[in-house]
Amino acid sequence: MSVKRGRHLFTSESVTEGHPDKICDQISDAILDEILKKDPNARVACETSVTTGLVLVAGEITTNTYVDIPSVVRQTIKGIGYTRAKYGFDAETCAVLTSIDEQSADIAQGVDKALEAREGQMTDAEIEAIGAGDQGLMFGFATNETEELMPLPISLSHKLSRRLTEVRKNGTLGYLRPDGKTQVTIEYDENDTPVRVDTIVLSTQHAPEVTLEQIQADLKEHVIEAVVPSALIDEETKYFINPTGRFVIGGPQGDAGLTGRKIIVDTYGGYARHGGGAFSGKDATKVDRSGAYAARYVAKNIVAAGLADKCEVQLAYAIGVAQPVSIAVNTFGTGKAAEDVLVELVRKHFDLRPAGIIRMLDLRRPIYKQTAAYGHFGRTDVPLPWEATDKAAALKEDVLKLEAN
């Protein structure tokens, strides 16, 4: 059983789509999507780096199609909002360099047995023959403290980041620029229930002529009050809005960016463990991505079934081997069934072999760019297959049967 804690604080952060690292994630996933539109069976491992006036796209891509990578890069940057040189980065004038190789033959031989990717028609033996593209461990998590079954600190942080972008793009606060960060500290009570917002930190890039006082007043009214439930705010809640006083130089001009450097923002805000693998730019044969999605799918269905208040699932793989080398379930003392029973139910109801995950979640589609900002999990704005709770009823039914016997 979990040890009782006193009242305590927990903090998570998010970033806007204009953050340098997030620009890279979106470019990598935009390239992946563009390839998958024409070649669903492509192997893609696409890394991006940005700095002042420069984008470098590198990686390993094996495909039978052609994609105009510089065009995809420029469209993505334009969509984010870097459209003028005075923003420090401009979609039309930045240099775009590419260095793309094919996937290593040594890796390919372990996963190539179904390059035609007939997951829908494959026999069990054929699925078994497709090994994982790498070794590694992945975690999935869910908790019933929010409607989307995500921890509240990361949930609110993402909503604030998204709202910063909304008010910039719709003209409500036209002086905002694309780069920004948010952070939310939540106070939990002795029962690990979130009770109030302790601290909110917002930092946003802005036009040079705007005063700090105006930014602070506008962000409190148009961002914080529009997103954070008033019931969670009290007179003790602390606000730090652009606490350095000025944030004019931002984006790739302010900091270099890299794909895969916001893995905690992408997942659970540090509330759950992380296996270390990044998501963006990787096709679904990479278990770093598909395994983490499957683990979230499993954990969310366990919580949605009422079998635990919170649940963390760990999966681990060996390169070239289809079956996970381990499956672990941790319910932190909140489980309504024993954890070993839950592991057996997971094995029964979820096909966690790489080709099985691809088939189960239909992952050969161009659905990834939309995940590259504002989190891969707990999304209510886009229909992501690993967020479905379609296995919850069957899990609950099996537990009831076991209890009856």
From Swiss-Prot:
Residues engaged in binding L-methionine: E60, Q103, D255, K286
Gene3D superfamilies: 3.30.300.10
InterPro entries: ADOMET_SYNTHASE_CS, S-AdoMet_synt_C, S-AdoMet_synt_central, S-AdoMet_synt_N, S-AdoMet_synthetase, S-AdoMet_synthetase_sfam
Keywords, sorted A to Z: ATP-binding, Cytoplasm, Magnesium, Metal-binding, Nucleotide-binding, One-carbon metabolism, Potassium, Transferase
PANTHER family in UniProt: S-ADENOSYLMETHIONINE SYNTHETASE
HAMAP family found in the cross-reference section: S_AdoMet_synth1 (MF_00086)
Name of the featured protein: S-adenosylmethionine synthase
Species per Swiss-Prot/TrEMBL record: Shouchella clausii (strain KSM-K16) (Alkalihalobacillus clausii)
Gene name of the record: metK
